[in-house]
Amino acid sequence: MDIERLKKVTTIQEFFQITNKGTISDGTKAFLEAMKEVRIPSGQDIVTYGQESDDGMYIILEGIADVYSSSNALINTLSIGDFIGELGLINDDIRAATVRARGEVVCANISKKLFDEIAFENRKVYGTFMNMLYTKTTKLVSERERIKSELAIATQIQTGCLENDFSCFNRLEAVKLTARMRPAKEVGGDFYDMFMIDETHMCFLIADVSGKGVPAAMFMSMAKTHIKNYATLGLPLAEVASRANNQLCYKNEAMMFVTAFICVLDLETNRVTFINAGHNLPFVQKADGDFQMITAKANMVLGMMEDVPYREQYLDLSKGDCIYLYTDGVTEALNPKQELLGDANLTSMLNRHREMAGDADAFVDAMYDEVDAFADGEMQADDITMVYLSRK
């Protein structure tokens, strides 16, 4: 194919260390001249997970391709200049992922057989490629370590934003509570909060931001701050949700949103006022009874549309009663058969441990163990968060 076209691709320039004047080594020239143009129709695999790598390496020249894991989960998107399967030229490993064309994709390709033939005739080709691959790998490792370090700091910051000392609440004569968040990545989009509004009103909530990773964590921090700021003013809960929603909609060009279940417990009347902003419905256990999912109508999620009205709803939480809040990382946990945990399994899990419902920490520990037992080693795909409160 046209070697001059290849020399204009930025990633090829970087990989093969092509100078600004377009000067290349004999080895690089032989390698690029051996490449051929291939067109992959929309929806067709460029490489397929588990297959041999005899077709070698591809470089995208036009179009976009999606990368899928062994479980067919979308994990990355590739575009012009991205390399696909370069390690296939130097080893016999099977493909580690599937790369599928999104629309027609034009690639430059060199097969493993052709690469071996050229390398046999011109050892500079092999040396050039290995040197460039080593340089690229070294840069990737360095960049990965930098990102890992930054994510570790982000994890510490996020952990510090979530309450993990519940002793001040548990000293209250009226409640026993705990909460926990286990992110799917270094940082997550789930969050919870609990705080006293005044001497007789306690707010507790759970929420789930769309997406994962650092963007979700940043949006989470904003949402948590807005909700708490308005709630501590003593505003009606519907107004708290409405104002927080409007703030999250402002300049929200990424169109992120938050599902949330926000509660205010009146310690004198046992009445819980709550707002359900598109979140999973919690379970309540009445004293000496089974856990049952509450019945409630959903409001709009936070951050999706401005000036949306939110309606308050109510439930009673008397002495001995418990409430369990959770995010969809619980019910959408997968087992090796790719089956969802679901509401029915969650109900059974809760009721298997209802005898320990008065011990908040032990109960939440048991629920995490139940989710892990169901997953049976399957990778956690979403943040898993729980909030548990029992009335003394």
Where are these regions (language model features)?
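Short strand-connecting beta-turns/loops that link adjacent beta-strands
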Residues: 52, 70-72, 92, 104, ...
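Active-site-proximal, acidic helix/loop segment immediately C-terminal to a metal-coordinating Asp/Glu
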Residues: 215-233, 317, 321-378
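Short beta-strand segments in beta-sandwich/barrel cores
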Residues: 36, 45, 64-69, 83, ...
